[in-house]
Amino acid sequence: MKKTRDNPCDKIELGNKTSQKGVSLVKKHIFEDIILQNALNFTEEVVEIFGDLLNKGMNITELVARIKELTDKLGRGAIEAIIEELDRIIKEDKRRKEKWVVERKDKKRLTTVLGDIEYERTYYKSKEDGRYTYLVDDALEIGRHDRIEKGVKIKLVENAIEESYERSSKKACPEELSKQTVLNAIREIGEVEVKREIKEKKEVRVLYIEADEDHVPLQDGRDETPRLVYIHEGREEKNGRNVLKNVYYKAYVGEKPEDIWIDVANYIEDNYKEEKIEKIYIAGDGAPWIKEGLKWILKSRFVLDRYHLNKYVLKATSKEPKYRDKIWRAINEGDKERVKKVFDELIKAAEEEREKEKIKEAKKYILNNWEGIKIYNEDEDVIGCSAEGHISHVFSARLSRNPLGWSREGLKLMAKLRVFSKNGGDLREVEWGKKKNINAGSYKLTKKQIKEAVRRVKTSTNEKINNITVLNIGKVTPIYRVLRALKYAQVI
């Protein structure tokens, strides 16, 4: 039988007990033992990965995946150990004994961004009012029925803002989650909006409002039209690009036009000194709901989006392109009568009745929106409209490309999330859900407890490092170097 030399890493003495390599001490030893053992196991496995790299070869993607799996595992072990240590500290606290009676210990499984963790915590009954709770869960803001921690939910929603529920569910954490879990997280966060902190209302001479709508299929076969309105102060150059200055986006699904514009008017009132504003331009495709804004926004004038103007000119001249230049010349000169005359000529030149109707439709559109066209020649502050590009980027890129269709609820929530993201919103700063934890604040560690716990862990860990066999042997190995670094740098 072939003899092999014992590896000093295979047996590590901790807490006066010996652990075989790879055997978890999580349920058998105290906090310091667990943390130190996990660190030792981590070092061994990194060395093992390095050996595989040298012996078998692997590319950077494989290397990163192996290391991430390892660090996630280390993190899960650390979190479990920390929660159980906190549970022990609470259980031994004199203040706790005065108010809470120990009932039993229960296991808890929780999905985190590192994967699933499982820990034991103590269940208590209040001496004062008879209610039951897990004090360590209350201290860490873990809800009684929580199965997924907030960090995972945030990732689910952040991913879902940009891609499908299915893809989002696969990226949030190592565990497999369902599309329904993603929707539940979105429902929990609700309709979010970035509320800008207003220290002082701004003074601007000109304000711009642009609006458009998207057409989104619903699961019941019908369409919904989420509407986008954004307010800005003009354009400015940044990094060689023209961008909108201080832009703020708003999304509406199912609201009446008057309610939309009352909301926009309130935003302007809250953020700007209205008496200093000389002009407000409302730009869009001329839809009635957009022009409704002229009734609610003081000092406002309509500007027709030139994208839609061009679309109708092209539509009218598709069979007779020679008339295109004539129409544009009349438009650019602000000559309404000349525009009418060119369109009449074009209608006469059309051979098919269908073509005539198409030309008449374009003529009607242009004449009905003439005020929004001639303003380009009359007012130097008019800068046009970029609503079509914005509706595509903010809404269509996510909302119009769902082949299965949206639920009305899901569409509204996602539209709000899209503009929340565009406005620079952070889901970590949002109050999630409406459920109130009646046990919140049931237990808090005192500064004295915290200081004593940290001192004890540091002292105990350093003592254990000093007693580890591999250090006393003195042979220089990877694990030896790590432990010396921990010992003399007092990392733990």
From Swiss-Prot:
This is UPF0236 protein TTE1650/TTE2708. It comes from Caldanaerobacter subterraneus subsp. tengcongensis (strain DSM 15242 / JCM 11007 / NBRC 100824 / MB4). Belongs to the UPF0236 family. It comes from the Bacteria. The lineage of its organism: Bacteria, Bacillati, Bacillota, Clostridia, Thermoanaerobacterales. InterPro entries: UPF0236.
